[in-house]
């Protein structure tokens, strides 16, 4: 199954800006991989909360549409809130 998530490049980085994003129901994330510069991105909580519950999400390639450009990635890690059904941060790796 293929998954597509709309995302934007983050202009601010750091703990304070990440907290502001989470408060606005956004998920801060990073895309990294060998030979490429890491990208810090942000996307809506509603875009990922349901699809990440699928069993094949972590083994399938995911298409992130970052500011209109398709980027193929694979989910590597998700940090979840301790008791709320929220994703606090996501790590993706370039494919």
UniProtKB/Swiss-Prot annotation:
Gene3D superfamilies xrefs: Ribosomal Protein L25, Chain P
Assembly and binders: Part of the 50S ribosomal subunit; part of the 5S rRNA/L5/L18/L25 subcomplex. Contacts the 5S rRNA. Binds to the 5S rRNA independently of L5 and L18.
Cross-referenced InterPro entries: Rbsml_bL25/Gln-tRNA_synth_N, Ribosomal_bL25/Gln-tRNA_synth, Ribosomal_bL25_short, Ribosomal_L25_dom, Ribosomal_uL5_bac-type
Name of the protein this chain belongs to: Large ribosomal subunit protein bL25
Function: This is one of the proteins that binds to the 5S RNA in the ribosome where it forms part of the central protuberance.
Chain's gene name: rplY
Highest taxon listed in the record's lineage: Bacteria
Entry GO CC: cytosolic large ribosomal subunit
Species this protein is from: Shewanella denitrificans (strain OS217 / ATCC BAA-1090 / DSM 15013)
GO molecular function, one term: structural constituent of ribosome
UniProt record, GO biological process: translation
Top-level taxonomy: Bacteria, Pseudomonadati, Pseudomonadota, Gammaproteobacteria, Alteromonadales
A Pfam family recorded for this sequence: Ribosomal_L25p
Keywords: Ribonucleoprotein, Ribosomal protein, RNA-binding, rRNA-binding
